[in-house]
Regions:
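A conserved helix-loop-strand patch within extracytoplasmic ligand-binding domains
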Residues: 1-29, 34-42, 46
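Second-shell loop/turn segments in exported
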Residues: 18-27, 51-52, 66-70, 112-116, ...
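Solvent-exposed loop/turn segments at secondary-structure junctions
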Residues: 24-28, 59-60, 78-81, 102, ...
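A ligand-binding cleft/hinge motif common to bilobed small-molecule-binding domains
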Residues: 38-39, 64-67, 71-92
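Short helix-initiation/N-cap motifs at beta->coil->alpha
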Residues: 44-63, 102-104
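Periplasmic-binding protein-like
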Residues: 46, 88-130, 144-162, 166
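Tryptophan-rich aromatic "cage" segments
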Residues: 164-174
């Protein structure tokens, strides 16, 4: 049973099952799940039919596994939690069986000309506002809830290095 997977080695239970990733280029729907599967000794060739599916989106992964088209799939944790909360019928026949270790994922970017357009210090102020959102304040909580987040943290380019290395190992980045 998949619901008893307690560590990465347990992912071997996915061998010979019909498995789908989300989008082929998704960090949380393909890249990181495939990396951890590989770490457990599971490669795409080990799935039923010696291939994996690609649903195209996290919501589609839920729908395809729920319909029985696939036995299991990988998707973004926030999408899963959002469906549990807001659309429980979609997930009522499904079970979460494993969560990848944490990694830096989404990031915020701004156009380089914001200082010219909105004045000196604008980018610094924008960054400060985003990083100081406080879930205890109702208006801030509404914003954070849209991202299913408790807060945002400062990240640096070097924190994405492992994702880049994984992308190269899986031939998704050349």
């Amino acid at each position: 049973e998949l619901n008893s997977i307690s560590n990465i080695k347990g992912l071997k239970k996915l061998k010979n099952l019909r498995f789908t990733f989300g989008s082929e280029n998704s960090t949380s729907g393909r890249l990181m799940p495939e990396y951890f599967l590989n770490q457990a000794g599971v490669e795409i060739k080990h799935f039923k039919g010696k291939k994996a599916g690609f649903s195209g989106s996290h919501d589609a992964t839920i729908a395809l596994v729920n319909s029985g088209a696939f036995d299991a799939g990988a998707l973004n944790k926030q999408v899963w939690e959002n469906n549990l909360k807001n659309n429980p019928k979609r997930t009522s026949n499904l079970e979460l069986f494993w969560i990848t270790p944490e990694y830096v994922d989404y990031h915020w970017v701004a156009q380089g000309d914001l200082e010219n357009r909105f004045g000196e210090g604008f980018t610094k102020e924008l960054k400060s506002v985003i990083l100081n959102l406080d879930i205890k304040q109702k208006s801030h909580k509404q914003i954070l809830d849209m991202f299913n987040a408790k807060r945002f943290i400062k990240a640096e380019s070097k924190q994405y290095k492992n994702i880049e290395e994984i992308g190269r190992k899986l031939n998704k980045i050349r």
